[in-house]
Amino acid sequence: MTELQELRRYRRDLHRIPELDFDLPQTIAYIEGVLAPLACEVTHPCPSCVCAFFDAGTGAAHATAIRADMDALPIAEATGAAFSSTHPGKMHACGHDGHMSMALAAATHVDRTIREQPGVIKRNVLFVFQPAEETTGGAKTVCESGVFERYRADCIFGFHVWPDLPAGTLASCSGPLLARSSETHIHIHGMSIHIAKTYGVPVGESHDAALAAAKFLVSERELMDELGADEPCIGKFGLLQAGTVCNAVAGEAHVAGSLRVFTDDMFDRAREGVRRVLDDACAATGCTYDLDFAEGYPPVDNDPELFANVAPALSELQLVDEPLLIAEDFAFYQRHLPGVFFLLGTGVPEGHENPSDSDGCPAYATSALHTDTMLFDEEILLKGLDVYKRLLLLA
């Protein structure tokens, strides 16, 4: 079996069985099945996590860790591919099937190399298959499990497929790459009365939760434009729920969104600004509120020294000019040990057509992540596997 055939088999098998959050029994069983014949120690250091440790046989003091996320999304697949999801309402729409496939292929490569070419891989290797990247940050539970201390891992690498980059493009940078995130929930409390009783009532005495929410959203947008002039910062509220009927003032409103920044200073400024404009909006309408900035993910911040060490081995690496305002729980690993995260392009190269194979899989991704038609061809994963091979050769 060629490496491409191996990658394709893993990816399509996993694509058929998407599972969510920490509830990953079929995915875990599949990964354990691939690892079973390999000369590695398989452990489960925390719930729904699979780790595979390979002893290089060189007396190495430390291990290199490779991470792959396993969870899918609650999306009904509409690709029409022959290997579409068999789990209704669930889909690998963020490429985690590809991430797992690259890691599994890298594991079989490590096993074969240690057996057939002793000493070529000089460091021990730890593969980490983690749950819940899309939800509660499964990486955090992995870090708290002690697995990195147990196997003396002193660096970690990971990938994310990225349709915004041309297929096969490898991109990263030293320092901040992806944003810090915080989900923000606001509950505005007013008083519901029939609209007929509001005639002549000043806005400040209206207790109109919907109006307070509207005022907040307009002012918050202006705030983010102002803060974003200094450094990247975005706060968008995609959820707005207010009232129960059309002919009564909304007594309650719920506004929820996400804040993305790269520095603690900007996070503090944005959080203070949101509270200030919310104070003003509620004071202007006679409402009160509860505000919760949920703990999100830290920024993905590539270790400068580790990046400088690995970059010479990756001659095709393109530098990301500006950090991206997406979030990834790989950041928790980087707070625990030095790490570098890479983006792997899956998009259509300029001037190329995009044919599909006999199973309905396009050569290049044409849909964004988290959409019901997101697909890519496994040939792109060969690039990621090749990068892992080169990283694992470093002493």
What are these model-predicted stretches?
Residues F53, L73-I75, A81-M91, G98, ...:
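Histidine/acidic-residue-rich, glycine-tolerant segments that coordinate divalent metal ions
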Residues I195, G200, A210-A395:
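Metal-dependent amide/peptide-bond hydrolase catalytic core
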